[in-house]
């Protein structure tokens, strides 16, 4: 099952989520929107197993990285019954 990984602009560029991911789904890319000059990116979402370790590792109060499991994605779009 496919999972969606969303990175929000509240990311502080700390790399905690990248280091927590056991399958290297995430990586850091340059970004001028924060002091660290980088933001998490999710180029390999097809490898995501939905463990949500990246969410747990995120130190921001806003959960800058979110994993939406297949059913959650469907429910959030209003397609689940």
UniProtKB/Swiss-Prot annotation:
EC number(s) reported in the record: 1.97.1.12
Enzymatic reactions: reduced [plastocyanin] + hnu + oxidized [2Fe-2S]-[ferredoxin] = oxidized [plastocyanin] + reduced [2Fe-2S]-[ferredoxin]
A Gene Ontology molecular function term of the record: electron transfer activity
Residues the record lists as binding [4Fe-4S] cluster 1: 11, 14, 17, 58
GO cellular component: photosystem I; plasma membrane-derived thylakoid membrane
Any Pfam family matching the protein: Fer4_7
CC cofactor note: Binds 2 [4Fe-4S] clusters. Cluster 2 is most probably the spectroscopically characterized electron acceptor FA and cluster 1 is most probably FB.
Keyword list, A-Z: 4Fe-4S, Electron transport, Iron, Iron-sulfur, Membrane, Metal-binding, Oxidoreductase, Photosynthesis, Photosystem I, Repeat, Thylakoid, Transport
EC main group: oxidoreductase
Subunit structure: The cyanobacterial PSI reaction center is composed of one copy each of PsaA,B,C,D,E,F,I,J,K,L,M and X, and forms trimeric complexes.
Protein name: Photosystem I iron-sulfur center
């Amino acid at each position: 099952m496919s999972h969606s990984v969303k990175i929000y602009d509240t990311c502080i560029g700390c790399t905690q989520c990248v280091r927590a991911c056991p399958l290297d789904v995430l990586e850091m890319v340059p970004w001028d929107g924060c002091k660290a000059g980088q933001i998490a990116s999710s180029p390999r979402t097809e490898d995501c197993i939905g463990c949500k370790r990246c969410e747990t590792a995120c130190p921001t109060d806003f959960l800058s990285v979110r994993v939406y499991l297949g059913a959650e994605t469907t429910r959030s779009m209003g397609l689940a019954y």
